[in-house]
Amino acid sequence: MTDMLTTPRPEAQGQFLVAALYHFVAFPRFAEFRGPLQAVCDANGVKGTLLLAHEGINGTIAGTEAGIATVLAYLTAQPEFTGLEHKESRAAAMPFLRMKVRLKKEIVTMGVETIDPNQVVGTYVEPKDWNALIADPETLVIDTRNDYETAIGLFRGAVDPQTKTFREFPDWVRNHTGLHNKPKIAMYCTGGIRCEKATAFMKEQGFEEVYHLKGGILKYLEQIPAEESLWDGACFVFDERVSVTHGLAEGEHTLCHACRQPLTPEDVLSPHHEEGVSCVHCHAVRTEEDRERYRERQRQIALAKKRGERHLGS
């Protein structure tokens, strides 16, 4: 049976508050915390994904202001999360279909067991000071995100490792000895969490001056006016908004639901684009079986839309 979710029209919903959060901390009781946290989120109409592990918490949630406030108050009331910080943005419609609290080995998967961001990380740089750092010719700027994210936006002059997953980043560093040619390393990611591990890893590898953007791209776009910005493009986000721009306004990108790659308006006009079936990035690798399966899913989504529902596979 196909799962459906009845959802009010976006114009009836108003704006939703989106909270992105993470916190590295020793958290041995993470498994037993899953049920109570799920219950608090469900009771307050909050949706999204939160990851729990021995090393802390990570995720993004959305809901009404009151709902988000209640969940955040519950989290910060826990002794492990008293220092929890979060970043806020807005969405015209609920950007998540359901609430998931998941147990993981790591809250962001790098696969290097010898580093601990609770012990060693790089130096935080506030958004207002970031431009001066990355404009310094003595600084090498590195984007720690994956290739589908960097494809739609980068800081000017940044090195793009073009990794498929964050697990590939350590090998990329080990294989690029030229990274030692400049005395300063400046690193950034979407919200800051990947840089916690990336800078810890760089320090372990012998890099001394390692910096990272506090609050990530999201905090920079929130605080730095477009006319002063060194950011080019949009920032990929892991919800139905797909991308955000300066002021955290929703971007113009959509998502290919076949390969999960972000699409520009120009990509959508390509003859290779068939909604939910293929796009400029994946059309060459789709079999006819794949296409027919995706077309059936699109038919189910269209039927759900006619009934005023949202298909959970959309």
Curated annotation (Swiss-Prot):
UniProt entry keywords in alphabetical sequence: Oxidoreductase, tRNA processing
**From which domain of life does this come?**
Bacteria
Query: Briefly, what is this protein's role?
Result: Catalyzes oxygen-dependent 5-hydroxyuridine (ho5U) modification at position 34 in tRNAs.
Q: Which PROSITE patterns match?
A: RHODANESE_3
One GO MF term, please?
oxidoreductase activity, acting on paired donors, with incorporation or reduction of molecular oxygen
Protein name as catalogued: tRNA uridine(34) hydroxylase
Q: What is the lineage of its organism?
A: Bacteria, Pseudomonadati, Pseudomonadota, Alphaproteobacteria, Hyphomicrobiales
State the species of origin: Sinorhizobium fredii (strain NBRC 101917 / NGR234)
**What SMART domains does the database record attribute to this sequence?**
RHOD (SM00450)
Family indicated by similarity: Belongs to the TrhO family.
